[in-house]
Curated annotation (Swiss-Prot):
Belongs to the XPG/RAD2 endonuclease family. FEN1 subfamily. This is Flap endonuclease 1. Residues 1-98 are annotated as: N-domain. It comes from the Archaea.
């Protein structure tokens, strides 16, 4: 879900090519969820192989990653670990929402209402361990590094960006800024023409760059105050925030209150100060290596085509594109591709 503070934040529109030569840590769960939600058949059914195993995430990961690399981007994917205890309520709520959407999807299918069915099917998307392991395996075969976060993937990606190991972190959620990423790229894995939900209208989605320094300067806040603002309007750890407080009103409160959380802690079901501390000092790890390698073409064909029934012609075309990028790069050589 993330934090609903987007309307307050200064953003810069980018072209993918503006990120040429940049290393970017991508929130893997965020990207995979997008692939599961958008890469579906007309009735909302996800792509599946002959054994009924979902493959939408593999299709998205394979072809979208190649697109990023053709633009000169060096992607690394960061996977979630164990969520904090106070995220339990939000995860339970999401599970309920998925179950409700699944029921509505089945009803819409029975009625032959394909547009409605697809809408509910997207909301029913769910990530499980099998999908995660498949995604990691594909990335390894493609020569793309992935990192296992001890807790939140966004926090780990932000840590990597703050260390300078990557140029930016990428996610749809603004939480990355709360975790301290100096640069956040949004829309990285959904760039292109996208259909608006429930409408026969398409829009052009472009990447956005948000700089933490610009955000703090624009809002006249410290990062600590930005976190307090987010808690007041609601985060994944206290969904909905404080009743009656929107972003603009919450901004005024945090600006002029030394301890804005104290007033609301008394009636909160969760420890607001624990949430603040988690954003300031989340669990992270240095146990990772960002090494980009040549793809294992034979194993990719075996994994995608033999095991999961992908079109061999399409996969081979993708591999040709991938091979071309890793051999010549876009405006950089093989030496700079492998350079950390």
């Amino acid at each position: 879900m993330g934090v609903p503070i987007g309307e307050l934040l200064p953003k810069k529109e980018l072209e993918l090519e503006n990120l040429n030569g940049r290393k970017v840590a991508i929130d893997a769960f965020n990207a995979i969820y997008q692939f599961l939600s958008t890469i579906r058949q007309k009735d909302g059914t996800p792509l599946m192989d002959s054994k009924g195993r979902i493959t939408s995430h593999l299709s998205g990961l394979f072809y979208r990653t190649i697109n990023l690399m053709e633009a000169g981007i060096k992607p690394a994917y960061v996977f979630d670990g164990k969520p904090p205890e106070f995220k339990k309520k939000e995860l339970e709520k999401r599970a309920e929402t998925r179950e409700e959407a699944l029921e509505k999807w089945e009803i819409a299918l029975a009625r032959g209402e394909l547009e409605e069915a697809k809408k509910y099917a997207q909301r029913a998307s769910k990530i499980n361990e099998i999908l995660i392991e498949d995604a990691k395996k594909l990335l390894e075969l493609m020569g793309i590094p992935w990192v296992q976060a001890p807790s939140e993937g966004e926090a780990q990606a932000a840590y990597m960006a703050s260390k300078g190991d990557v140029w930016a972190s990428a996610s749809q959620d603004y939480d990355s800024l709360l975790f301290g990423t100096p640069k956040l790229v949004r829309n990285l894995t959904i760039t292109g023409k996208r259909k608006l939900p429930g409408k026969d209208v398409y829009i052009e989605v472009k990447p956005e760059l948000i700089l933490l320094e610009d955000v703090l300067k624009e809002l006249k806040l410290t990062r600590e105050k930005l976190i307090e603002l987010a808690i007041l309007v609601g985060t994944d750890y206290n969904p909905g925030g404080i009743k009656g407080l929107g972003p603009k009103k919450a901004l005024e409160i945090v600006k002029y209150s030394k301890d804005p959380l104290s007033k609301y802690q008394k009636t909160s079901e969760v420890d607001l100060y624990a949430i603040k501390e988690f954003f300031l000092n989340p669990p992270t790890t240095n146990d990772y290596k960002l090494e980009w390698k040549l793809p294992d073409e034979e194993s990719i064909i075996k994994f995608l085509c033999d095991e999961h029934d992908f079109s061999e012609e399409r996969v081979k075309n993708g591999l040709e594109r991938l091979k071309k990028v890793t051999k010549t790069g876009k405006q950089f050589t093989l030496d700079t591709w492998f350079k950390k």
